[in-house]
């Protein structure tokens, strides 16, 4: 109604974060600081390689892929998206954006479409179930090592049209639900 939009991404980092709850709060503590690199050039638990800029300290950045995204057209929101999923977040968000804006898919189809992921190291292209055999064969012929994987992201999204606001819950998350206005 007012043209406002928010995209939010949160994390515990590892499953159950640090593995303890702050006394008297019920809040499970995360371990997002693990995303700083302990040693430049060495891979972290997720296979991401950090450098000097990712060492802990003032004005340094952790190796985080959080990408809460609001896409604007003429200064107005047309798509709000984001996802959990560690290093797979950026490719998941990009694929939803490309599906909606370039392929003109309805937001629910864009969110539900199978996804692939490549993150520099390892040299695998991780593919979710649902890609047709021709696509996978074409990737293989181009030299890509195809590695089947289970879904690892959940890109809940909102499309804003001239007439409506349309929510799309990603079925990769059990119990996901989108409610329109």
Q: Which functions belong to the PLM regions below?
A:
Residues 1-150:
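Proteins synthesized as precursors that undergo proteolytic processing into mature forms
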Residues 130-181:
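Cofactor-centric catalytic regions
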């Amino acid at each position: 109604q007012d043209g406002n939009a928010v995209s939010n991404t949160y994390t515990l980092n590892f499953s159950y974060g640090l593995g303890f709850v702050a006394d008297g709060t019920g809040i499970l503590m995360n371990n997002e600081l693990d995303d700083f690199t302990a040693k430049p050039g060495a891979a972290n638990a997720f296979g991401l390689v950090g450098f000097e800029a990712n060492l802990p300290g003032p004005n340094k950045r952790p190796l985080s892929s959080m990408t809460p995204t609001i896409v604007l057209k003429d200064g107005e929101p047309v798509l709000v998206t984001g996802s959990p999923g560690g290093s797979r977040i950026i490719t998941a968000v990009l694929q939803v954006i490309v599906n909606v804006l370039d392929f003109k898919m309805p937001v629910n189809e864009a969110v539900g479409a199978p996804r692939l992921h490549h993150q520099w190291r390892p040299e695998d292209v991780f593919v979710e179930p649902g890609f047709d055999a021709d696509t996978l064969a074409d990737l293989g012929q181009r030299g890509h090592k195809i590695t089947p994987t289970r879904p690892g992201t959940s890109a809940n999204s909102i499309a804003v049209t001239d007439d409506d606001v349309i929510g799309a819950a990603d079925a990769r998350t059990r119990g996901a639900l989108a409610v329109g206005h």
